[in-house]
UniProtKB/Swiss-Prot annotation:
The keyword Isomerase applies. Keywords: Cytoplasm, Isomerase, Porphyrin biosynthesis, Pyridoxal phosphate. GO terms for cellular component: cytoplasm. The lineage of its organism: Archaea, Nitrososphaerota, Candidatus Cenarchaeales, Candidatus Cenarchaeaceae, Candidatus Cenarchaeum. GO terms for molecular function: glutamate-1-semialdehyde 2,1-aminomutase activity; pyridoxal phosphate binding; transaminase activity. The modification N6-(pyridoxal phosphate)lysine is found at residue 258. This is Glutamate-1-semialdehyde 2,1-aminomutase 1. It holds the Pfam family Aminotran_3. It comes from Cenarchaeum symbiosum (strain A).
Length: 421
């Protein structure tokens, strides 16, 4: 059965036919049948070079050999124990090695679960309730952060989700990203935490202005606020040590997900020992999950980190060169066509905004021409390239993309930009 038939069947048993809002686009999304390396194949037999990459999770590509072998071996040993394992200990040690700020780590299942735990932990540690987040930053689908969020909520125009109690939403102060004056005005000694995507990856790609992250660190330390880096996207993606290594700023608490698991669901929340010790059973901040430390996902994460650490000396420079060349090619082609555009890129993640003004925050991202982006997205699909169907997401490269893949992607963008004109 092809994608159209599958979607009609899905709508009868799945809300709107999809299990995550941003996966939908009219009239129906393609349904995946298989994926390998840098490409994905749909139920109709079409093959696409995959620049969605699991929304950035597949740094090593689909079906990386080391990950597949580790998962296959673990499936034979067991899939769920609900008691500690040696592999959990080794994974926490590896994470601490790559992220020295994560002196102690609790494994969870998703990035949203990690940020929920991080915020609860910060509130318990500081005995304060209020948090600061940034307009357009997305930190998962839970109440404290579904206020002026990015990702699918921005794409659908849902500023604050229904079902979030007003009292809870009032505990979240939302300010513009990259606005130092706004942060200085909001920071106070009644704030438990400041949570931020060090590079916004759920409002397109928006890098921090020079000195912005250092200001967050400085004022957080001065006022006793816990600085939370949500590295769900940037972790392992910008470097083996994430954004905190790339920008030289250490948070109090870090969340990791996506690339951590190499395509399997796993996340982590970690920080200074004196903070993490507040988690139950040693402390009174409660967090628990049946599938936390799931041995199959842990085996995938171990294989992913070990592979990344082994090849990082050539992996990140290669991805940087490839992404820089692709972004430059897209910019040149757009200029030749007379299109207003901004190509925002950090390391191997990027986004095309159809606008003449620099995109530095959620407001400027929302002023970009979303209808033109949609035309480009559909033309890319037609020409065999899959990117996320929203300008408020990102495109990314993986270790599996070949020179030929990137040549084809560049040509597809050239054609798609023409269609968007």
């Amino acid at each position: 059965m092809g994608s159209r038939g599958l979607f009609e069947r899905a709508r009868k048993v799945i809300p709107s036919g999809v299990n995550s809002p941003v996966r939908y686009y009219a009239p129906y999304p393609f349904f995946a049948a298989s994926a390998s390396g840098g490409s994905i194949r749909d139920a109709d037999g079409r093959k696409y070079t995959d620049l969605c990459n699991g929304y950035g999770a597949l740094l090593l590509g689909h079906g990386r050999g080391e990950v597949v072998r580790a998962v296959s071996a673990q499936l034979r040993r067991g899939t769920l124990f609900c008691v500690p394992t040696e592999q959990e200990v080794e994974l926490a040690r590896l994470i601490s090695g790559n992220y020295p700020s994560m002196e102690s780590t609790r494994l969870v299942n998703t990035g949203g679960e990690a940020t929920m735990t991080a915020i609860r932990l910060a509130r318990g540690f500081t005995k304060r309730d209020r948090i600061i987040k940034f307009d357009g930053c997305y930190h998962g689908a839970h109440g404290s952060v579904l206020v002026k969020a990015g990702s699918g909520s921005a794409h659908l125009g849902i500023s604050t989700s229904e079902g979030v109690p007003r009292g809870l939403a009032r505990q979240t102060t939302v300010i513009p990203y990259n606005d130092e004056a706004a942060f200085e005005g909001a920071a106070a000694d009644d704030v438990a935490a400041v949570i931020v995507e060090p590079v916004m990856g759920n409002m397109g790609v928006i890098p921090p202005k020079k000195g912005f992250l250092r200001l967050l660190r400085k004022l957080s330390s001065r006022l006793g606020m816990q600085l939370i880096f949500d590295e769900t996207i940037t972790g392992f993606r910008l470097s083996a040590g994430g954004a905190q290594e790339a920008f030289g700023v250490r948070p109090d608490i870090t969340t990791l997900a996506k690339a951590l698991g190499g395509g399997l669901p796993i996340a982590a929340v970690g920080g200074k020992k004196n903070i993490m010790e507040r988690l139950a059973p040693g402390g009174s901040v409660y967090e628990a999950s049946t599938f936390a430390g799931n041995p199959v996902s842990v085996s995938a994460a171990l294989a992913s980190i070990r592979t990344i650490n082994r090849i990082k000396g050539r992996l990140y420079p290669r991805l940087e060169r490839a992404a820089a060349a692709l972004a430059s090619s897209i910019a040149d082609d757009a200029a030749d066509l007379g299109l207003d555009r901004q190509i925002n890129r950090v390391a191997s993640i990027f986004q095309v905004f159809f606008t003449a003004e620099p995109v530095t925050d959620a407001a400027s991202a929302k002023r970009a021409d979303a209808a033109r982006f949609d035309k480009m997205f559909r033309a890319l699909l037609k020409n065999g390239v899959f990117v996320a169907p929203s300008q408020f997401e990102m495109a990314s490269l993986s270790a599996a993309h070949t020179v030929e893949d990137l040549r084809n992607v560049s040509a597809a963008y050239r054609t798609a930009l023409g269609a968007a004109r």
